[in-house]
Amino acid sequence: MDLARVHTPRGWYDDFVNRLVNCARCPRLVSYRSTVKPLRRYESWSYWGRPVPPWGDLNARVMVVGLAPAAHGGNRTGRMFTGDASAQNLFKALFLLGLSNKPYSVSRDDGVEVRCVYITSAVKCAPPKNRPTAEEVYNCSSWLREELEAVRPRAVVALGELAWRAVLKILGATTAAFKHGEVVNAAGVRVYASYHPSPLNVNTGRLTVETLAEVLRRAAADAGCL
């Protein structure tokens, strides 16, 4: 895959989102995403319940790739890494580096702006128990491939093993074992591995905001963002 860097047109992004939100390739995900029962604290919300669009700086040099939208996060708010605990951990780290203007991400109208960073996921719909099937990951791979070709990042930070494997496969790299802090060069892109900023990983001490920020810092520095 040739990922020579060029300007990413706004027209591509708008067209991409319009196509993405109407995707119905995976019957299990279509059924689940639209029938998630709101948590009590979100009973007043009208859940998004569709494929969740990526967002960020369209001229980004760093692409952050997560697993999939959270049922009560992106699937509720309609924006990836927005409205759940994983999102808050990620944005605390981005804020520490000056890559986000706020240390949180709670809704599409929260005024958050990121610099040099584009945020997306390997799977675009919330999966039951946060576990997409191999077929669902494959079905979504064409979306992520299109994003990589359009945005042409210099660095990718893969949050979690599934995102790591999905990115490397699209870039045509020999799959390297997932290890936090690992770096692989593939198709002219430096791909960084990080544990996912989930509450489980943070609460057990496997990952901290600081160790996540360090991986992001290395990627951003290598990409020329810092």
Swiss-Prot record:
Record GO terms (molecular function): 4 iron, 4 sulfur cluster binding; deaminated base DNA N-glycosylase activity; DNA-deoxyinosine glycosylase activity; metal ion binding; uracil DNA N-glycosylase activity
Pfam families listed in its UniProt record: UDG
Keyword Glycosyltransferase (UniProt): no
Sorted UniProt keywords: 4Fe-4S, DNA damage, DNA repair, Hydrolase, Iron, Iron-sulfur, Metal-binding
Temperature characteristics of this protein: Thermostable.
Cited InterPro entries: UDG_Type-4/5, UdgB-like, Uracil-DNA_glycosylase-like, Uracil-DNA_glycosylase-like_sf
Enzyme Commission designation: 3.2.2.-
Top-level taxonomic group: Archaea
Binding site for [4Fe-4S] cluster: C23, C26, C125, C140
Any one GO BP annotation for this protein: DNA repair
CDD domains: UDG-F5_TTUDGB_like
Signal peptide residues on this chain, from the entry's feature table: none
Enzyme category, top tier: hydrolase
Function: DNA glycosylase with broad substrate specificity. Can remove uracil from double-stranded DNA containing either a U/G or U/A base pair. Can also process hydroxymethyluracil (mispaired with guanine or adenine), hypoxanthine and fluorouracil. Exhibits a clear preference for double-stranded DNA substrates, but can also process uracil in single-stranded DNA, with lower efficiency.
Family named by the database record: Belongs to the uracil-DNA glycosylase (UDG) superfamily. Type 5 (UDGb) family.
Protein name: Type-5 uracil-DNA glycosylase
Organism: Pyrobaculum aerophilum (strain ATCC 51768 / DSM 7523 / JCM 9630 / CIP 104966 / NBRC 100827 / IM2)
